[in-house]
Amino acid sequence: MNIQQVIAITGAGSGIGLELVRSFKAAGYCVSALVRNEEQEAGLRSEFKDAIEIVAGDVCDHATNEKLVNKAVARFGHLDCFIGNAGIWDYMLGVDEPWEKLSGSFEEIFDINVKSYFSGISAALPELKKTNGSVVVTASVSSYAAGGGGSCYIASKHAVLGMVKALAYELAPHIRVNGVAPGGTVTSLAGPASAGFDKTKMKDMPGIDDMIKGLTPLGFAARPEDVVAPYLLLASREQGKFITGTVIGIDGGMALGRK
């Protein structure tokens, strides 16, 4: 049990992020969660009551990330781990799209999938330095291979892989930095507004389970609860203390190619 450990999680209102809140809370962590809007805040409040801290706001806004950290420290006294998990998909957006659509989508995707992680880490860093804490970010099987999205999404997830390596080197020996790379996981992941996908949810795509199953050697599409275990390992001071600069794949073998 990690009763005294305090963790801040972005993208915590749905999908993998929501499952992370549940899993870390069950493991004894104190949790501060950043969600997108009041609807998600109400959902977490209904489930967790006052057991966790909740911030609703734009993950790309640095003041919002600072608020997430400050609320964690104000209530629980310190911060041990920051998890950057917010993200959007591009719904296979191609480079042959009109430039205005492509450029806007690129900016949205990189703002959320990459820049928001830097913002959250920057906000958390002063507190993590006090505790010799750690960072975990959500990468993807698309951090290693093509085919898991369009070029904007794949480029953003390759950037996350580079971020993990660079920051692990920069912040050692006092702060560990790692990532988790899920494969095909059915969630409510939305897309860029510039491409008209901001109201679209991956889980509602016709045939999404069969599509992921066909790409995954283990033969099934994951759900959020199937991919949270590596986050718990990497955040743990005891079990993860000798791990940094590592991205753990949990993709059903998708990175190996089709069977």
Swiss-Prot record:
The active site is at Y153. One of its GO terms (molecular function) is cis-1,2-dihydro-1,2-dihydroxynaphthalene dehydrogenase activity. Substrate binds at S140. NAD(+) binds at residues 8-35, 58, 157. InterPro entries: BphB-like_SDR, NAD(P)-bd_dom_sf, SDR_fam. Keywords: Aromatic hydrocarbons catabolism, NAD, Oxidoreductase, Plasmid. GO terms for biological process: catabolic process. It catalyses: (1R,2S)-1,2-dihydronaphthalene-1,2-diol + NAD(+) = naphthalene-1,2-diol + NADH + H(+). Catalyzes the oxidation of naphthalene dihydrodiol into 1,2-dihydroxynaphthalene. Belongs to the short-chain dehydrogenases/reductases (SDR) family. This is 1,2-dihydroxy-1,2-dihydronaphthalene dehydrogenase.
